[in-house]
Amino acid sequence: MRPEDKKKVVEDLHVRAEKAKLAILTDFRGLNVAAMSELRKGLRAASAEYQVVKNTLMTLAIEGTDLEVLKDELKGPCAVCLAYEDPVEPTKALTEFAKNNKKFEIKIGVLDGKLVNLDGLKALADLPPREVLLGQIAGTLNSLPTGLVQCLAGVPRKLLYALQAVRDQKEAA
């Protein structure tokens, strides 16, 4: 690759690294073209992209970004998955792909500028999508006022029942 081409790759990757909310390093050795195409297609559907980049170029590209913590992890053949929206969906796609392709290995990830190990990535993959989580939170927040109203209305209701019982008792006597 010519130096001008390398510079362009670094600049392009730097821009994408700045926008990425999540980055996951993988070992792609042993994957054929069809498997790589399948993986890329699944990641595109999850608003992410997958690229094989030389470690030296990747090191230059992530300088000054949240992904800079990956510098020490760039050893051996690496490919990077960059997610720009919900970090859960691409992580799910990668872990599913790793289950189905024994040669594919997830190394480590970065979320919000912090390294996330394989166990953390698996836990992230088990989370429901962002929209579902927001719906659960909204439902919980909505149930709090409803429960409070029910609780507050219970005291006068019980008083009315007691008064009704006293009235019925006096009428019967």
Curated annotation (Swiss-Prot):
One of its GO terms (molecular function) is large ribosomal subunit rRNA binding. PROSITE patterns: RIBOSOMAL_L10. GO terms for biological process: translation. It holds the Pfam family Ribosomal_L10. Gene3D superfamilies: 3.30.70.1730, 6.10.250.290. GO terms for cellular component: large ribosomal subunit. It comes from the Bacteria. InterPro entries: Ribosomal_uL10 (IPR001790), Ribosomal_uL10-like_sf (IPR043141), Ribosomal_uL10_bac (IPR022973), Ribosomal_uL10_bac_type (IPR047865), Ribosomal_uL10_CS_bac (IPR002363). Coiled coil: none annotated. Keywords: Ribonucleoprotein, Ribosomal protein, RNA-binding, rRNA-binding. Belongs to the universal ribosomal protein uL10 family. Forms part of the ribosomal stalk, playing a central role in the interaction of the ribosome with GTP-bound translation factors. Part of the ribosomal stalk of the 50S ribosomal subunit. The N-terminus interacts with L11 and the large rRNA to form the base of the stalk. The C-terminus forms an elongated spine to which L12 dimers bind in a sequential fashion forming a multimeric L10(L12)X complex. NCBIfam families: PRK00099.1-1. This is Large ribosomal subunit protein uL10. The gene is rplJ.
